[in-house]
Amino acid sequence: MPLLLATTLANNSHHQHLSTTATETAAAAATAKAAATAAAAATATMLLTSPTAATHCLAAATSAAGVNVQITGQGVSATLNDDQLQLPANYAANVGHLNGFNPKDNCPPVPPTSERAFEGLLRLPQIQVKQEFMESPPERPSCHPMNHQQAPANSALATSCRGKTILNPWYLRPADGIGYHNYNSNNNNSGSGEINKDVSQQMTSACGGSDGQTCLPVSYFGMETLASVKQRQKSLPDFLIPLHEIMFQQQHHYQQRTMGTLINSLPPGLVGYPPQKTETFKSLTPPKALQHHQNNQNHQIPQNHTGDHSFVRHFHERDRLIREHQLKHQQLRDVEEVLQEQEQDEEQEHETLRKPHVVPSELEHNHHWHGVVCDANGHATRLLHIAPPRAGPTPLPTHQQPPVGEVLPPNSTSFSTIVDPPKEPSIYEQPAPNGRHCRPANKVMRHMSNSPTPPSPLRSLSDCGKSFEEEELELGENCEMPQNLSSKRQARELDSELENEVLDLAPPPKRLAEEQEEEKVASVNPPQPVAFAPEEMHQALQLQLHSYIEMVRQLAPEAFPNPNLATQFLLQNSLQALAQFQALQQMKQQQREDPLPSYSTPLAKSPLRSPSLSPVPRHSKSQQRTPPNSMTANSLGMSSAVMTPNTPSMQQQPQLQQSTPKPTSGLTVASAMAKLEQSPEETTDLEELEQFAKTFKQRRIKLGFTQGDVGLAMGKLYGNDFSQTTISRFEALNLSFKNMCKLKPLLQKWLEDADSTVAKSGGGVFNINTMTSTLSSTPESILGRRRKKRTSIETTVRTTLEKAFLMNCKPTSEEISQLSERLNMDKEVIRVWFCNRRQKEKRINPSLDLDSPTGTPLSSHAFGYPPQALNMSHMQMEGGSGSFCGSSISSGE
């Protein structure tokens, strides 16, 4: 509620803007008024001779003014004196610090009553001053007992109630004329366009008293009458409510809850200025019983959206009205559209009934459109005599009609009320999920796309079994429908006859008859696989390739700058497609002859195979697998001979002890493709490697060898040392495809030798000495060897080994043998030193890739050695083949 009237200039925060004459006048007037009010209050009430009487007087005065003072009674009697209530007009000055003034201002209160005035009394913890919104109607002066003894004076502050639109306290709002124009001031319509006005003139003119009492304007305290609101409405638009009134609204409520000593109303009994006009003030608080009649009169006044509502509520209300208006118009438009549609439908029905029915005489131009014929004008005419029967009972005409047709407009999609079959999913009109119909794409352009390069003429295997009509159906379902108004309306409007009818999606009788004939023929004679001669297919593919290359050159000449490369690429793709097609035919024939057994467990999946590498599913006759070395060429099929490394596998059908004879066409294509150059890893299949790794691990464990034993044995037998890590990675399929292909024949040879040796020894434990007796004379068995003593290497030998390591970090077995002979050291010691040195280098430089099985020479500058220090001419081997670059297969850590 609007706060206390600052009757003294000393406690006014804006007193620096006032003149000295106004200061003297205001001080004199305040002193005179205060003395008169004190005398009147003392004579009207009891004599304040005791602390109890003073307390009761204070409580009565403040409660009548709208301020609730709760006194607990502890420590009050010692602080109350008679002289503290002598000047009730100084009540505002003594509690001014509670309203935002500085109590320790340079200008003391006028006049100082004592050292401990009301300020000290209100600071006691036992007293709480609470703000209450209390109504005090000015037309009933009997409600205020202290107003009977006060002379009427001019004042704009009548009661403690606040105007509705001003929700923030007065001390949070800047003064009028300081920096901005206050829209809520009474001087807004004075005619002067000045923004910075004299504050003293406003303060003195607001009260309007002849005594020159200085006070703040009405709008400064946030109180407005109906007259001021109406006056502001004339010049202020509806939406120009000052922004600070909205911004400070939440702050005001926060202070209203928290500040218990906030006094937002000035007691009219203490001030002594009754209102000049008896105007009704608006209130935000619920009405009391005494003011019920008056508030009812106030509520009967029609409320407007300028001052009666807040800024946000005004816009919410306006948006709601706009939405209601738009909704009403939309409903009216919908009703009009429905009526217009009904009128159009009736007109079309009358037109179709008036027109003579055209009987089509010839059906030569019926391009397989079931029930639809195009006449010379391009209109589609539907035949009624070949329509399928309805699924539900429909009203039929009483008289018989010859088979006639209905002329459909080209763009019309509305239903008709005459006997018309439900629209079938034919080529002419395709039913879409959203209820619309569309025409399919052009048949001639069905293979063309938006891309500059047309698609390949080679169709994928997944499209081989599709008929032409199925493709047209798919094209019709995927095409986009025109978003016109008639299609939107038709989606929600149906004819009265077709509304409750069951949709007949059965195929037309012509197609049903064809399918029945095909089923009969298929039941009598099973279809034989299409057998094309390879020469005919090759010629057809060549023709397609030539036409395709010409199309590419015409449409996008920059797509293939080199036509020879394009021809080779397309030829390779065509050969692959031909091989896939033949393999698919062979697999289908095999499935018809010998149906696949039902599997209880799913087929094993290869971790090295991606789904894109094998477009055709693989099937096997049984769950048992044999090592790949025992498979014949026929059991592997022709996929390994035809596929490139990009598509290493198309199908594998390992058949145990049987194989279907391949047609001659497959052998011809395979022999033609076998002439191309192929690396060893291209002929090796991923699944074959996987099966061999699994078999090798099982056989090794059964023979009793460790992975390290296999690596050492292969180094002594074949001259290539392998570490335990390399064998482990091979078994776990963690090596690259190239290294796996190169390791496979060596490990396969070792496995065969181990099997033969075990068979010769009668199944005993295999001793590696029987295999390496001709190559080396190692006395101890690998299986029974013990841990060797730690070897100490001399400084000169270590320097030589470091130089050799810089040249090649992974030497071969031959290079290690040469180093051992030159340094008079054991070959195993040198091999272990190189392994340890690689691990050390990996810890020092983690970025170096020392795990690859290919040995690469390290840079001399990376280790800080000058190139001259790495001159190892004495280590160069004879014959020009001497190099410390390791082979592609060496021990990998």
UniProtKB/Swiss-Prot annotation:
Q: Where is the composition biased (Polar residues)?
A: 623-646
Q: Name one GO cellular component term.
A: nucleus
UniProt biased composition (Low complexity): 602-617, 647-665
Location of region: Disordered: 586-668
Say yes or no: keyword Cell division present: no
Show the GO MF annotations.
Answer: DNA binding; DNA-binding transcription activator activity, RNA polymerase II-specific; DNA-binding transcription factor activity, RNA polymerase II-specific; RNA polymerase II cis-regulatory region sequence-specific DNA binding
Tissue expression from the record: Initial expression in cellular blastoderm stage, then in ectodermal stripes during germband extension. Broad expression in the neuroectoderm followed by limitation to discrete subsets of CNS cells, and expression in specific PNS neurons and support cells.
- Report keywords, A-Z: Activator, Developmental protein, DNA-binding, Homeobox, Nucleus, Transcription, Transcription regulation
DNA-binding region residues: the ranges are 786-845
The question of whether NAD is a record keyword is answered with no
| Pfam families in UniProt | Homeodomain, Pou
* UniProt domain POU-specific: residue ranges: 681-755
Q: Where in the cell is it found?
A: Nucleus
Its GO biological process annotations read: central nervous system development; ectoderm development; generation of neurons; neuroblast development; regulation of DNA-templated transcription; regulation of neural precursor cell proliferation; regulation of transcription by RNA polymerase II
**SMART domains found in the cross-reference section:** HOX (SM00389), POU (SM00352)
Q: Specify the superkingdom.
A: Eukaryota
- What does this protein do, in the record's words? DNA-binding regulatory protein implicated in early development. Involved in neuronal cell fate decision. May act as an octamer-dependent activator of transcription. Could also play an early role in specific ectodermal cells, and a subsequent role in the embryonic nervous system.
Query: Which family does the entry's similarity section mention?
Result: Belongs to the POU transcription factor family. Class-2 subfamily.
This chain belongs to which protein, by name?
POU domain protein 2, isoform B
What organism is listed for this UniProt entry? Drosophila melanogaster (Fruit fly)
Q: Its encoding gene is what?
A: pdm2
